[in-house]
Design a protein with these regions (language model features):
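Conserved beta-strand positions in repeat-built beta-propeller and related beta-rich domains
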Residues: 16-22, 65, 73-77, 84, ...
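Beta-propeller fold detector
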Residues: 35-46, 102-107, 156-174, 229-243, ...
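Short loop/turn segments immediately following beta-strands, especially the blade-tip
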Residues: 97, 151-156, 221-233
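Beta-strand-rich domains and repeat architectures in extracellular enzymes and scaffolds
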Residues: 1-27
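Beta-rich, blade/repeat-based domains predominating
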Residues: 1-11, 49-74, 111-132, 143, ...
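Beta-propeller blade signature
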Residues: 29-35, 87-99, 146-154
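Loop/turn-rich, solvent-exposed surfaces of beta-rich toroidal or solenoidal domains
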Residues: 199-226, 237-282, 292
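Blade-loop segments of beta-propeller domains
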Residues: 28-80, 84, 89-90, 103-111
Length: 297
């Protein structure tokens, strides 16, 4: 099975996610214990229960340890990139002290669309009563977006829905391992990669959210205060977006305490570093870096 998410808790525990993309996935979330994969929090939770879809992991794309004793689990509920199973998409908080699910955040139909693919998540506890979560919708069939979740009451809403900055660049044709990358359909025909908003990172002070479509080399940012402000319509919100330049084509991103952004460059088997002053450089290049995705620091 192919891992897409990796995260390390404040106590050094390592967790990995395996979305169901066609491989034989025995469990979609695991903890690495003694160099072995162990279903987390247990095997039962990793078995799809159609009678209780909110209490099980269906196809997890991202896991994020918050450094405060919680593992956040983002369940696409969309195995094989299918339409999300009705009522299955969710954000789950797991207590790392008890290894029990503490809270489940589900989404209404106007937030998780039939085309939605929940990709990655960032958490900020400094705003609101209990904090906010920011999630990328990396749909390749519908509008991309950033989904905002109020962690106090579970309310969620889509922002920059279908905006050009959350949408795949139609002029972008990636080259990976020296070859043009295209979709190949079951009938043998090829089509362009159209994956929308994917990579996401938040600044150390929580005031800036960085994001990028997967089918693009561009990096964007937006102030999180205006992103959360529902009184600002998307038609106006887009004017607050800042274009930060070409960083290379990325899947995942992360920021550190010094305000530096680290982003994968899957076309060049590299990791890029973007300094607060906007300077960009490559810090690692290796043929072993095949499609660098999730980062954890």
């Amino acid at each position: 099975a192919m891992p897409t998410g990796v995260t390390i808790s404040e106590k050094g525990r390592i967790f990995v996610s395996f979305p169901k993309w066609g491989d034989d996935v025995k469990f979609t979330v695991a903890e690495i214990v003694d160099n072995k994969l162990v279903p987390y929090p247990d095997l039962k939770t990793n078995k799809v229960d159609y009678d209780n879809l909110l209490r099980c992991f269906i196809s997890v794309q991202s896991v994020v340890a918050d450094g405060c004793g919680t593992l956040w689990v983002l369940d696409t509920a969309a195995p094989n990139f299918s339409q999300p199973i009705d009522g299955g998409s969710k954000l789950i908080a797991v207590d790392l002290n008890t290894n029990k699910i503490r809270r489940i955040y589900s989404f209404p139909d106007n937030v998780v669309l039939p085309t939605t693919y929940l990709n990655d998540v960032r958490i900020d506890y400094r705003v609101g009563k209990e904090g906010y979560a920011y999630i990328t919708d990396s749909s390749d069939k519908g509008p991309g977006a950033i989904i905002v979740v109020d962690l106090s009451d579970g309310r969620s809403f889509r922002r920059l829905n279908g905006d050009s900055t959350t949408t795949a660049n139609t002029d972008f044709i990636p080259k990976v391992e020296g070859k043009v990358l295209l979709n190949r359909d079951t009938d043998g025909k090829t089509s362009q990669i159209t994956i929308a908003a994917d990579g996401i990172a938040i600044s150390e002070d929580g005031k800036t959210l960085y994001y990028c479509p997967l089918a693009s080399r561009d990096l964007y940012s937006i102030n999180t205060d205006v992103l959360r402000d529902e009184s600002i319509p998307d038609s106006v919100l887009c004017s607050y977006v800042k274009y930060l330049g070409e960083k290379g084509a990325s899947d995942g991103m992360i920021t550190d305490s010094k305000g530096i952004i680290y982003a994968g460059d899957y076309e060049n088997n590299s990791i890029r570093r973007i300094s607060p002053d906007g300077e960009m450089d490559t810090i690692v290049h290796s043929p072993h870096l095949l499609w660098p995705d999730t980062f954890t620091i």
